[in-house]
């Protein structure tokens, strides 16, 4: 099949296009909703029942997505127009096999295979000429010590394969080496390598969203969303804002030009059609941008685009349109946000099934609460997000944080608040 320009939309269960999502979490759920607005039939596949995406899909399957046999059986039964991986825990060999059989894997099997593995991804990014931090690889404690010494302290260690920043560690001195190695070893899954990176003293970490799609003439075309800012706590997204800065001077214009250049190069290197989310570090003082990682699908930091972007232009809508072969209408190369907005996570600090939420204090003017619908709560699991709009980035960030910190979560008859305050406004 492959991707084709789509000029006719149909009806689910009849003559509409069909998308299959491998992984049906909160990000997949939002993409599904956008696709359903265009009359698309949705099939959700995940490792557990009643995942967020399954709650809105037309049909769903629970299976081990690392099993080739299981994936092939579901795909052959459903025969989707496109297969959209949402998580890393997938048998990528099967994706290549399906692609050879004519199925469209979004953005393409090679992009998924590359982006899920930090060594492959870092080498791919470096090959484009994009600026990166210095880096070394290690396989055991001795080579890890040597890599840290060569890079110098402070430095950052990460497993070659992990999701949502698991196993990442900032080493401030040689005293942190053994602890960092143990953290990486716990999270590195099937890989035996760890990457050690130079610590970049950046002002802001940004997500640059880029999208490749078929234009009205059926030719490949690319667009870029103005970057959004975000911060992480222990490797996990905690808050994001869009645009990344209120400033619009020549220095910012120059930095953004470099951001779009890097995003375009990396997207071209990975290939395929869909949305790409590029994590980068920006050193505004020295006018430098460092490419860090890329996800070839919507990113958790991009949840803010639900509030910031024009209707039909959130990261989820852009991904759905690109995968379906629908042109993205925009004057120029850069899609600008409609509103200044921010997001802030709602975390669980309790454990149990079927969480409940006290949200009465979170509904301030120009704010909204998104509950993902995950059936199980455990410590620091992301269960929802607050979105807020305001006149400035600073005000939007404060508003989202304030609202999120009024939310309480219960899964065992005990209510717990939002306890993490690191990097927060006081």
Swiss-Prot record:
Which positions does UniProt annotate for Mg(2+) binding?
279, 293
Which key words are in the record? ATP-binding, Ligase, Magnesium, Metal-binding, Nucleotide-binding, Purine biosynthesis
Leader sequence segment: none
Q: Keyword Endoplasmic reticulum on this protein?
A: no
Q: Output the InterPro entries linked to this UniProt entry.
A: ATP-grasp, ATP-grasp_carboxylate-amine, ATP_grasp_subdomain_1, PreATP-grasp_dom_sf, PurT, PurT/PurK_preATP-grasp, PurT_C, Rudment_hybrid_motif
Pathways involved? Purine metabolism; IMP biosynthesis via de novo pathway; N(2)-formyl-N(1)-(5-phospho-D-ribosyl)glycinamide from N(1)-(5-phospho-D-ribosyl)glycinamide (formate route): step 1/1
Q: Which PROSITE patterns match?
A: ATP_GRASP (PS50975)
Gene Ontology biological-process entries: 'de novo' IMP biosynthetic process
What is this protein's function per UniProt? Involved in the de novo purine biosynthesis. Catalyzes the transfer of formate to 5-phospho-ribosyl-glycinamide (GAR), producing 5-phospho-ribosyl-N-formylglycinamide (FGAR). Formate is provided by PurU via hydrolysis of 10-formyl-tetrahydrofolate.
The protein's name is Formate-dependent phosphoribosylglycinamide formyltransferase
